[in-house]
Amino acid sequence: MGTILKKTLALVLAAVFALGVFAGCDKGGADSTEPDATEPAEEAKVLKVLTLGSSSSVDSNHMINLVAAAEGIGDYEEVMIGTLYYSGCKLYEHVQFLTQDSPVYRLYLSSTKTGDRPPETMDDVTMEMALKFNCWDIIVLQPGGQEAMVDETYTNGNIGIIRKYVEENRMNPLAVYGWHTIGVSSTDPELTAMYPYSPNAYAESAAKYNYDRERMLNERTERMERFVMSDPSYVYVIPTCTAVENAITSYLGQKGIKRDYTHLTDVGRLIASYVWYCELFGIEELTEIKVDTIPKAFLKSTVDKSQDLVLTEGEKAVIMEAVNNTLKNPLKITPSQYTQAPAE
């Protein structure tokens, strides 16, 4: 893709997004220009996060702006979230796409300035375009669901190739890395049958683990401990997988948290977005869930999308418990105390 077309699309992206003024950024420096050495550097007011991922990233990031707008963003004036999406994308596919400069991605963009509406999107984006679209402060990597469970994912060099490309093309040389862990396969027959891409997808991906969710979780946890948690370059680790599994042990179950074999319901998406929010802002414990309603524009799994989804007190209790238990034990599934649906 030519340079002129890339620049044109970047301008279109900015026009479509229209969520506020982006921080200035030079290739050779961080946000804005170099400050005068005699003047104190101005503290950054906008937090910008980009995830290189898949539909699981879209699920998990979908309501971060909604959560952050409700819960507060500290000293920041704005939080901007970007998600570079390709369906079911694995790390090796990211390598293929960046090598060929393939415009195969969809870029999702959201902001706390528009916390009442879901991300805007733009198609036909390359990884380079996404990296250069903004001065991202945090760039998050994410393996595919099955990739996360095998040693080869962490040792075959693909992660290094992606990181090298990021460092060559990012606009902010001070950007740090994050790592996002996604959920494991559902074992509910109705949900596995609803997988939208291939009727054999569940069998192909989970048969090697004998359809054993606990085993899949253990395989993932072991790799996380050995390859990610021990690597200080991952400043942020976002274990949405743990929170999702915590919530599944509640009365909501798999059907209340997942809308098919792998994707999340609206409540599941909110749980994942709360984990992101807490990790980004260093929240150690939630004392309440301030999101009372999911605006209808955000809804995906709810049948009636003509009106906002009002959360029940039971759902809010499960959300807070699942997230808090994840903050305490990020790699351990903690059974819910809410195993019976409340009378509401």
Where are these regions (language model features)?
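Conserved SGNH/GDSL esterase-like catalytic core that processes O-acyl groups on lipids
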Residues: 58-155
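Alpha-helical cap/lid subdomain in secreted, periplasmic
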Residues: 123-262, 266, 278-280
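C-terminal motif of bacterial Sec signal peptides marking the signal peptidase cleavage site
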Residues: 20-24
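Sec-dependent N-terminal signal peptides
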Residues: 6-15
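Bacterial signal peptide processing site
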Residues: 26-28
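Conserved catalytic region of serine esterases and O-acyltransferases that act on ester linkages
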Residues: 256, 260-344
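Short hydrophobic segments within beta-strands
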Residues: 50-52, 84, 180
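N-terminal module-boundary/linker segments of secreted carbohydrate-active enzymes
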Residues: 39-73, 319-322, 329-340
